Amino acid sequence: MFNEEQFFKDDKLVIGDREFTSRLIVGSGKYKDFEETAKATEASGAEIITVAVRRVNITDPDKPNLLDYIDTSKVMILPNTAGCYTAEEAVLTAKLAREALGHGFVKLEVIGDQKTLYPDMVETLKAAEILVKEGFTVLPYITDDPIMAKKFEDIGCAAVMPLAAPIGSGLGLQNPYNIIFIKEAVNVPVIVDAGIGTASDAAIVMELGVDGVLMNTAIAQAKDPIKMAVAMKYAVKAGRLAYLAGRIPKKMYASASSPIEGMIGR
């Protein structure tokens, strides 16, 4: 009996010392409550959920806590340093997260501009160097610059996370060629982060051969977040499988699907 899961069984996403079956990473912000966050995460099939340490409670047991809703035996909590504008703030936030969660994985964000929420590459690189030296598994949020992506790999980051478009914009992938250049430049996983708007955006990104995609607003702010989470699960799988299958080359003119030999009048 045909089983489509055979195509994904051995196709793991490896980050640092961990393996994941799903290549979709989801965020935890912008949902109406933690219950909806948990339902959407489960529906997406994601095995990693990012959490803004400065905005989402994961430490105070006397307040609503995301950890009460997420099964951490199935889903890894990936803390991020969202809201940090300097390397020093990001390093401190990462250390607090490691103490709270008991692991050193961190999605590193150091924002340089409030309007675009573009990352400050100088401060991000500075923070990454410190965190790598202190034993963290660092996944930096970066611009779609292949030169900078290589620098982050060279200092020991476990993955790079270039943006598709500004955070929360829903614009979809704006510069596919730079993402391809990044994928060619580095040997660590490339996880496209930010700017996804709908399922087709996720599929297009994955068709480029990147290792994963991270999204939050596209699911959390959809009219029906649970349905969109399911759509994204299948979009990421479809894009990955299409990449592995190999698309046909683009041609200027038509190419008939059926042979003309034996046709009447031929």
Swiss-Prot record:
Record-level GO BP terms: thiamine diphosphate biosynthetic process
GO MF terms, alphabetically ordered: thiazole synthase activity
Pfam family, any one: ThiG
Subcellular location, principal: cytoplasm
EC nos: 2.8.1.10
Reaction equations catalysed: [ThiS sulfur-carrier protein]-C-terminal-Gly-aminoethanethioate + 2-iminoacetate + 1-deoxy-D-xylulose 5-phosphate = [ThiS sulfur-carrier protein]-C-terminal Gly-Gly + 2-[(2R,5Z)-2-carboxy-4-methylthiazol-5(2H)-ylidene]ethyl phosphate + 2 H2O + H(+)
Gene Ontology CC, one term: cytoplasm
Name the record gives this protein: Thiazole synthase
Source organism of this protein record: Persephonella marina (strain DSM 14350 / EX-H1)
Gene this protein is translated from: thiG
